[in-house]
């Protein structure tokens, strides 16, 4: 069974998806490089990456911040939905009216909407002098509020309901199959958003362009959606985040 799944993931649509994920991480890595190394990239025709990192408090800056969040969402959220996509791919072998690309496009469309809202929030926080232009929190109060929000959300019924669907992708697709791949992709994206939006906003605490934070957060969200072990992570993570919020507020970090 495992060998069959590995072979199936060698097909074109899977390779394209892995290419999107890899490209997103590669661009984020390039954007996170120190400015002198990014400038050196101009010699190799990579000056466009330098321009992407020039974030300014105007419309062009908002576009760049939105692009940054889009890359983050693709890099971090696409890996967390791989088990659900594998389930869909298995069903597609026996059920008609399937389209893997439409499903993924619908899913990513939801995260595009989130990225736009997150970029607007980042610019608003910047104008309030609560974060830097690159989204790093300048306020212990803001960091503490985001941590306690994410921590308490771990215990919410909404989070639990969304996680239950993420952990049972077979039941999810069978329930909504007749809606078609595009609408199912959007619905899957909304369910994922319901699971992860609060954790994603912790980028303002960990650093929007902090690759270590992104990597850790991605692994946590992937594990949390696994049916066998995810349930053992959700509430302890919530306790840890609430405790961290208290520590940040008291320490003024």
Predicted regions and their residues:
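Histidine-/acidic- and/or cysteine-rich, low-complexity loops and terminal segments associated
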Residues: 1-70, 126-135, 157-175, 242, ...
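Juxtamembrane transmembrane-helix termini in multi-pass membrane transport proteins
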Residues: 6, 65-108, 112
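Interfacial loop-to-transmembrane junctions
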Residues: 7, 219-243
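Small-residue-enriched transmembrane helix starts and helix-helix packing motifs
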Residues: 53-74, 143-150, 176-188
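Transmembrane alpha-helix/helix-exit interface in multi-pass inner-membrane proteins
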Residues: 112-127, 140-167
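Hydrophobic alpha-helical transmembrane segments in multi-pass integral membrane proteins
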Residues: 115-122, 191, 195, 244-253
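Alpha-helical transmembrane segments and their membrane-interface junctions
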Residues: 118-126, 193-212
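A mid-sequence, solvent-exposed acidic-amphipathic segment
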Residues: 152, 157-198
